[in-house]
From Swiss-Prot:
GBP repeats lie at residues 226-275, 276-325, 326-375, 376-425, 426-474, 475-524, 525-574, 575-624, 625-674, 675-724, 725-774. Coiled coil: none annotated. The gene is GBP130. This is Glycophorin-binding protein 130. The PEXEL motif is involved in the protein translocation through the parasitophorous vacuole membrane and into the host erythrocyte cytoplasm.
Length: 774
């Protein structure tokens, strides 16, 4: 028992010893490895330092060699120039000697005089040689000193070198002025050759100062737009800065104004005097695409902003929880996406915005100081058009393009019109027929047209279902039809008059409804045919045709009598036909019945109480000025009939959807997509609360648009030139308003914000909204 225990003890001791040795050996091995690593690291650092030192030495040597070589080249250059100047001086001396010898030979007639002159010339030559030797030695000494100084000073005194050389040349000139004029010329040429380098150095900072001045000008406090109240001046400056802009601007301008003098000639020679070839929009667009593919890109961008038909929107609209189509009614979001895709677009949009808004404060000062206070040229597009014609005959083609788009008068239609039994203009005044042809050519077109139609009329059948099921019944504030339905319930008389007006605008004959149900295609074909509706109205009421034609003439100014007057007038620019008020006055004289019907239509639009009719008849001036003054009418109606305001507000809400309850509901709504930026009338209400003066200025703006100043009518009759200046001159009106009320500008900007929805707060609210689409 004991032995076994001892053996056990021994065995355990041996094992412990082995374990101890193994642990020590592992420790020593780790220490050795760490030491080796330290040695390697130190060697690596040492070698890297050596390499860095070697490269540094090489760099310093190369740099010194470069500097010395540069200095040596400069010294050689100056030595070469010095030797060249000396050689040129010797050449001039030799030439002078030859010329003096020739002159002396010609002048001396006798030998005695010749011998004396030779002696004199020898003496002079000796003197000149001595002077030359002295001047050469002085030149060498001075140039050597200059070269030494230049080498010691270095590159920083390049400009001083030119000055020293100039001083040397000037001293030589003073010494050699008496007999060496040609030598002075060569010296001057040499100095001029040296001057450009110094001048270049001095000119470099001047260019930078010019650029700095331009930066300062751009960073000036008045950044609004420098001649934005002078669109033509703005356009001219834009032309200078961006010639590409002129092409696009001219296209758009031609599209808007459509007043080529050649058209006037064609109109006179045509059999039908009412303007023939003003024509086929879509076909014209296709031809424009073929001739200028760049045009399509810009047109599509502008079209997207107006109609908001981005295909991505369509996808988002279908996936959205709220099916009311809010992204497509967000032009600002569309614009932002366009900016991201094409930053060049923003520049052109801003230029166009400046031309439209004309808000340069400097222009205001210039306008007041001008002799002619009406500022006619900038508000005289016809004069501008005439100048454009002279500068660019291509103008006509592009102008006709857009005019054809708006009026749909395809030349082929003109042929069909002449051959038709009914000469009343069937297809050319039938844009829906044009649409049907477009459907056949491009089925994609129909989808986009329907989307745009839904946005305007809010007639999505799904919306109707959602509206009925919704807890909040006021979702129809962006639904004018729902508003109309509520009005029908309150006032059945209203429905009759509204339906008449609605039929004229939308052509929704109940017979069409029957045809629509029976048609294979349920998407409403005949109700989108206003001309067919008009033809049926003609059959039912021939009186209607006469009045409709009169109203059409007032809008389009196509009275055949005007055509005769235009030919006989001394001024061929034709302003009587663009004078609808004069046209109305002539219509009154020819047909007093017309006035009654026109007043009915006017009442529907402006809510003119029949009691006003009595007041109008008793008025001293029988021309009906108050009816052409809606704001004055509204003010008088408010005083006489407070009930009037309610009806006017109802009609206003239908058009603009500005129920005050909507504002509250919008804030409480879960869907934050439409806060206040898509609600211009809510903006108006807030403006009223903050600034009651706003209403007055809004009325001023309305007068400018409609030109219904009673004084204008008097001035028009008394004016020598019958072109109707003041009434067709809204800018002159603006000038008078500015003189009377400088506060006007501020309020005009408010109105601009309402139209464009550019409140900075809206942008912040939009970004913070849960749904970031609008």
């Amino acid at each position: 028992m004991r032995l076994s225990k001892v053996s056990d003890i021994k065995s355990t001791g041996v094992s412990n010893y082995k374990n101890f040795n193994s642990k020590n050996s592992s420790k020593y091995s780790l220490m050795e490895v760490s030491k080796k690593n330290e040695k390697k690291n130190s060697l690596g650092a040492f070698h890297s330092k050596k390499i860095l030192l070697i490269f540094g030495i090489i760099y310093v040597v190369l740099l010194n060699a470069y500097i010395c070589g540069d200095k040596y080249e400069k010294a050689v250059d100056y030595g070469f120039r010095e030797s060249r100047i000396l050689a040129e001086g010797e050449d001039t001396c030799a030439r002078k000697e030859k010329t003096t010898l020739r002159k002396s030979k010609q002048k001396t007639s006798t030998r005695t005089v010749a011998t004396q002159t030779k002696k004199d010339e020898e003496n002079k030559s000796v003197v000149t040689e001595e002077q030359k030797v002295e001047s050469d030695s002085e030149k060498q000494k001075r140039t050597k000193k200059v070269v030494k100084k230049q080498i010691n000073i270095g590159d920083t005194e390049n400009q001083k070198e030119g000055k020293n050389v100039k001083k040397v040349i000037k001293k030589e000139k003073k010494k050699e002025e008496s007999g060496k004029p040609e030598e002075n010329k060569h010296a001057n040429e040499a100095s001029k050759k040296k001057e450009p380098k110094a001048s270049k150095v001095s000119q470099k900072p001047s260019t930078s100062t010019r650029s700095n001045n331009e930066v300062k000008i751009r960073a000036a406090s008045n950044q609004e737009t420098l001649t934005s109240a002078d669109p033509e001046g703005q356009i001219m400056r834009e032309y200078a800065a961006d010639p590409e802009y002129r092409k696009h601007l001219e296209i758009f301008y031609k599209i808007l104004t459509n007043t080529d003098p050649n058209d006037e000639v064609e109109r006179r020679n045509a059999d039908n005097k009412e303007d023939l070839t003003s024509a086929d929009p879509e076909g014209q667009i296709m031809r424009e695409y073929a001739s200028d593919p760049e045009y399509r890109k810009h047109l599509e961008i502008f079209y997207k902003i107006l109609t908001n038909t981005d295909p991505n929107d369509d996808v988002e609209r279908r996936n959205a929880d709220n099916k009311e189509d809010l992204t497509s009614a967000d032009p600002e979001g569309q614009i932002m996406r366009e900016y991201a895709a094409d930053p060049e677009y923003r520049k052109h949009l801003e230029v166009f915005h400046k031309i439209l808004t004309n808000t340069d404060p400097n222009d205001e000062v210039e306008r007041r100081n001008a002799d002619n206070k009406e500022d006619l040229t900038s508000a005289d597009p016809e004069g501008q058009i005439m100048r454009e014609y002279a500068a660019d005959p291509e103008y006509r083609k592009h102008l006709e393009i857009f005019h054809k788009i708006l009026t749909n008068t395809d030349p082929n239609d003109e042929v069909e019109r002449r051959n038709a039994d009914n000469k009343e203009d069937l297809t050319s005044a039938d844009p829906e027929g044009q649409i049907m042809r477009e459907y056949a050519a491009d089925p994609e077109y129909r989808k986009h047209l329907e989307v745009f139609h839904k946005i305007l009329t809010n007639t999505d059948p799904n919306d109707e279902v959602e509206r009925r099921n919704a807890d909040n019944k006021e979702l129809t504030s962006s639904d004018p039809e729902g508003q109309i339905m509520r009005e029908y319930a309150a006032d059945p008389e209203y429905r009759k008059h509204l339906e008449i007006f609605h039929k004229i605008l939308t052509n929704t004959d109940p017979n069409d409804e029957v045809e629509r149900r029976n048609a294979d295609n349920k998407e409403d074909l005949t109700s989108a045919d206003p001309e067919g509706q008009i033809m049926r109205e003609y059959a039912a009421d021939p009186e209607y045709r006469k009045h409709l034609e009169i109203f059409y003439k007032i809008l389009t100014n196509t009275d055949p009598n005007d055509e005769v007057e235009r030919r006989n007038a001394d001024n061929k620019e034709e302003l009587t036909s663009s004078d609808p008020e004069g046209q109305i006055m002539r219509e009154y004289a020819a047909d007093p019945e017309y006035r009654k019907h026109l007043e009915i239509f006017h009442k529907i639009l402006t809510n003119t109480d029949p009691n006003d009719e009595v007041e109008r008849r008793n008025a001293d001036n029988k021309e009906d000025l108050t009816s052409a003054d809606p704001e004055g009418q509204i003010m008088r109606e408010y005083a006489a009939d407070p009930e009037y305001r309610k009806h006017l507000e109802i009609f206003y809400k239908i058009l603009t959807n500005t129920d005050p309850n909507d504002e509250v509901e919008r804030r409480n709504a879960d869907n934050k997509e439409d806060l206040t930026s898509a609600d211009p009338e809510g903006q108006i209400m807030r403006e009223y609360a903050s600034d009651p003066e706003y209403r007055k200025h809004l009325e001023i703006f309305y007068k400018i648009l409609t030109n219904t100043d009673p004084n204008d009518d008097v001035e028009r009759r008394n004016a020598d030139n019958k072109e109707d200046l003041t009434s067709a001159d809204p800018e002159g009106q603006i000038m008078r308003e500015y003189a009377a009320d400088p506060e006007y500008r501020k309020h005009l900007e408010i109105f601009h914000k309402i139209l464009t929805n550019t409140d900075p707060n809206d942008e912040v609210e939009r970004q913070n909204a849960d749904n970031n689409e609008a």
